[in-house]
Amino acid sequence: MRSLGLDIGDRRIGVALSDPEGILASPFTIINRRDESLDIEAITDIISQQQVGQIVVGLPRSLDGSLGRQAEKVKEFTQKLCSHTRVPVEYRDERLTTVLAERLVQAVKTKKTREKVRHDALAAALILQGYLDEGREPKLA
């Protein structure tokens, strides 16, 4: 079962997909926000085409852990998305993933490679990978 990771922003939505085994997350695409219904349609098309069975949405929290206005926007959009799909959704704390993604993109040596890697999709992959890794950690008795 593939999992879909979303990094929802005001201008773009970063999208990541896991492999079918749910082990590795990779950046997939970026949706440039235009209209909410078109954004939802683009995501539901990906869900259908890629046979997604789980959605992980990055929830932007403040450093103190509180939810701000951006987190509320993400939750509102996610609720609307949920009304268009039966795929279960989970939230994952995304504090600092965009910053880490930007630093990783800057660390890439060539300009040509940097241009191909968009930090929004990479942030979505980091969010999704954290979720996948968390599910595989051995539980101590």
Segments (PLM) and residue ranges:
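Phosphate- and other anionic-substrate recognition elements at nucleic-acid/protein interfaces
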Residues: R2-L4, R11-A141
